[in-house]
């Protein structure tokens, strides 16, 4: 077995950012990075936004001006973790007679046959696309290999069905339609983006997708493959089901966090299916209210408990980019027997590009909150999510780049009270809406 101070399991954005944030924070010990793919770490948003126009991988080191091979002590490519085991504390390790290096607290075995002992393990294992078991003929879009297969199926104009009207589904729909393909979207909820924005505002986003057929409140109950066509069975809310065949069918049903490693821990109660790994605001894994020392989770596999925003759900690029700063600081503080420093965390931020349209969401939209919309044009508006006493919890910005900086500043310290009378006034800058500095 081999010792490493920090073992980072997963080499997506959150994983490599953890490596670099540790170095930036002054960590001088060894860092091992396990990359489950053969390809160097790459960016995922371009897979849906630029599938046909950018076939090459957008490597994160190039895109973010990083040098991960220099920052990590060891990188193991095409290597996944198999088991995670807690190591009992060395009985002779005391404050007066510490071991020669940080005491290993976790042991990880891998598909490459290695056995790593680590003082800290960071789970950045990501997530995989959800696909019902019987849908073998359906494409997904989560990895470079997924993108390559889908691109190969779309070399000529095709009729494409996209099952799922979340961010990835509508980004892909707009992109493919712009490149000559005929698109049909099936969504089980009443509108596109209903889970993310609420039905009213998801319906408004749908107006940005002209010439795309959209079936909402419609469940796909069966998918079969017949020669070079794929047939779906659709069940609307009322009336009989129907069938339709397509050249290509893509499932955009969300993602399931990779939490398998926790099943090998006797301390960890089984997580509900599809649930992310629970962590506190510094990324420390927390099971049944108890922090597991030296075990951390970040990125698409984890949900963090934030004191201002509540549970920060996974799946957002900006969260994977920024959260490792707090995690690295917590690791450094732990090694120095100190409390993590108070590091400001930006408001949660989701961004999307739907064809020519740019969308930003700052904060956490609550569907039971009041919404007020400031309209600039038919394709440009800002929606504010707030309580009855004008506590602002989220801002949705559609095609209004001048408002993004203001929204970021407005929510920089968490939900804030605003002047509700000025929300619809297009002449009032967003940054001036706060009523309680």
What kind of feature is each model-predicted range?
Residues 2-4, 301-402:
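Mid-to-C-terminal Rossmann-like scaffold of FAD/NAD(P)H-dependent oxidoreductases
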């Amino acid at each position: 077995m081999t010792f490493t101070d920090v073992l980072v399991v997963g080499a997506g954005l959150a994983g490599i950012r953890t490596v670099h944030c540790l170095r930036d924070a002054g960590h001088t010990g060894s860092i091992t990075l396990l990359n489950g793919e053969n390809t160097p770490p790459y960016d995922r948003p371009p897979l849906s936004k630029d599938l046909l126009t950018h076939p090459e991988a957008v490597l994160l080191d190039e895109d973010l001006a990083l040098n991960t091979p220099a920052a990590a002590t060891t990188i193991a490519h095409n290597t996944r973790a198999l088991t995670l085991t807690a190591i009992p504390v060395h009985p002779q390790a005391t404050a007066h007679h510490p071991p020669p290096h940080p005491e290993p607290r976790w042991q990880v075995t891998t598909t490459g046959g290695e056995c790593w002992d680590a003082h800290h393990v960071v789970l950045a294992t990501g997530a995989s696309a959800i696909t019902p078991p019987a849908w073998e003929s359906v494409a997904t879009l989560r990895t470079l290999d997924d993108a390559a297969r889908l691109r190969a199926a779309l070399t000529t104009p095709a009729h494409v069905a996209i099952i799922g009207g979340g961010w990835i589904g509508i980004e892909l729909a707009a992109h493919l339609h712009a490149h000559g393909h005929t698109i049909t979207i099936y969504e089980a909820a009443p509108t596109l983006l209903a889970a993310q924005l609420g039905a009213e505002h998801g319906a408004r986003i749908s107006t940005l997708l002209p010439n795309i057929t959209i079936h909402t409140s419609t469940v796909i109950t069966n998918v079969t493959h017949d020669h070079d066509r794929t047939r779906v069975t659709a069940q609307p809310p009322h009336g009989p089901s129907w069938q339709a065949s397509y050249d290509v069918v893509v499932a955009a049903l969300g993602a399931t966090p990779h939490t398998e490693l926790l099943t090998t821990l006797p301390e960890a109660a089984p997580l509900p299916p599809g649930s992310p790994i629970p962590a506190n605001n510094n990324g420390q894994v927390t099971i049944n209210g108890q922090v597991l020392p030296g075990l951390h989770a970040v990125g698409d596999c984890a949900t963090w408990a934030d004191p201002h925003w509540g549970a920060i759900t996974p799946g957002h690029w900006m969260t994977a980019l920024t959260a490792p700063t707090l995690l690295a600081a917590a690791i450094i503080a732990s090694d120095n027997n100190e409390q993590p420093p108070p590091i400001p965390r930006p408001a949660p931020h989701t961004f999307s590009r739907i064809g020519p349209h740019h969308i930003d969401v700052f904060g956490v939209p609550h569907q039971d909150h009041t919404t007020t919309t400031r309209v600039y044009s038919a394709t440009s508006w800002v929606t504010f999510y707030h309580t009855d006493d004008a506590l602002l919890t989220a801002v949705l910005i559609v095609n209004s780049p001048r408002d993004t900086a203001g929204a970021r500043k407005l929510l920089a310290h968490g939900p804030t009270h605003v002047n509700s009378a000025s929300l619809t006034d297009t002449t009032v800058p967003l940054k001036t809406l706060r009523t309680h500095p």
